[in-house]
Amino acid sequence: MSEEKKVVLSREYVINLRRAYEVSRTKRAKYAVGLIRRFVARHLKVEPKAVKIGQLLNTALWARSIEKPPRKVRVAVEKYSDGTVKVELKE
């Protein structure tokens, strides 16, 4: 039987992405995704592989091309009973 995932924890964060501007221009958006993944993993005590980035958040990071991701992003984070974490853009 398939077990339905239940939300164990729900939080909102404002993640500062200014460190993405310290890397090469052609790697900034990809690095920003990694920053978000590592930030959420550290705060919710999970592995970075368990963090799933939402489609709207990914689109917002890549909207101004790879060279100019946003400086900050407000996100809503949900941790599920199976240990996975979903990160969505908070509007």
Curated annotation (Swiss-Prot):
InterPro entries from the UniProt entry: Ribosomal_eL31 (IPR000054), Ribosomal_eL31_CS (IPR020052), Ribosomal_eL31_dom_sf (IPR023621)
SMART domains, per database record: Ribosomal_L31e
PROSITE patterns the record matches: RIBOSOMAL_L31E
GO MF annotation: an example: structural constituent of ribosome
Alphabetical UniProt keywords: Ribonucleoprotein, Ribosomal protein
Tree of life domain: Archaea
Example of a GO cellular component annotation carried by this entry: cytosolic large ribosomal subunit
GO biological process: cytoplasmic translation
Pfam families, sorted: Ribosomal_L31e (PF01198)
Recorded family membership: Belongs to the eukaryotic ribosomal protein eL31 family.
Protein's name according to its UniProt entry: Large ribosomal subunit protein eL31
Gene behind the chain: rpl31e
